[in-house]
Amino acid sequence: VPNDNPVTSPAPLRHLLAEVAMARLAEAQALNEEALRQALSQGRPAKCKARILAVVSSKGGVGKTTLCAALASTLHLKGGQTLAIDLDPQNAMQYHLGVQPDVAGMGSASLTGESWSDLLLPGSAESLLLPYGALTEEERHTLERYMANDRHWLARQLARMTLDENDVVILDTPPGRTLYLEQALDVADQIVVVTNTDAASFLTLDQMDSLLATPNMRAPSSEYSYVVNQFDASREFSRDMHEVLKRRLGGKLLGVVSMDHALGEALAYGHNPLLGAGSSPACQDLLNLSEQLKSRLEF
């Protein structure tokens, strides 16, 4: 007589499989712990050949990830590839670069010892993306403990990727001072601080300047600059704040990107506005910014 009841795995088998998976993860973490101990005894690794750009901000909501994705789409050196690495647990860069959401990413690879190069995903405009990936709270704490215990953790990860001198790596970091930011500052050749023409952003400038001036916080040869994002020229207060920022930042002000709601709408529709025939003022600002950074990276 046919059995119409669905076949289910016995509970003990599910438990055994879960135990095997947990044991595998524990073994990988133990290997990582041993690798960390060995790495710490070796000091700082050799500098990665690729040009590294860190995009940072003191506060959220300034359009940092959107700007980071725009640079990943437009900033290319001849003969090289451009990689965006999402160091932000929000894991939002994948949506900006038109990449299908993936569970695997930088986080899980770092815990299991996988090569970051094997997890790169193709994004828009021939860019490549290493997403942050999906982690449990416990896994994220473990990852951040690795970073806290090894000042040059990110430098070691990048060194394993065997990148070329014409490659560009763009790092998207969480807002504020975090372990991810400190790791990014340790390896970056160029640091772009994204700010807005609002009072809250202005009040964080001293905090960021102080951090960037902290001894040994960033690579000795690195340079940093500011970009004013989402500038609304139709508002008098925004125009006044723009003038205040120009005076405050002086030569550290690299560029200004106009407010353009179409950039956010493009994310909703899954296309890259920088690749279209018609170019808005904001798109042109982003292209100009990309060219300026390209000239700085071509050393």
Task: List where the protein language model places each region.
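Conserved catalytic-core segment of NTP-binding enzymes
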Residues: 78, 164, 168-258
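Short, hinge-like loop/turn segments at secondary-structure boundaries
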Residues: 99-104, 211-212, 242-244, 271-274
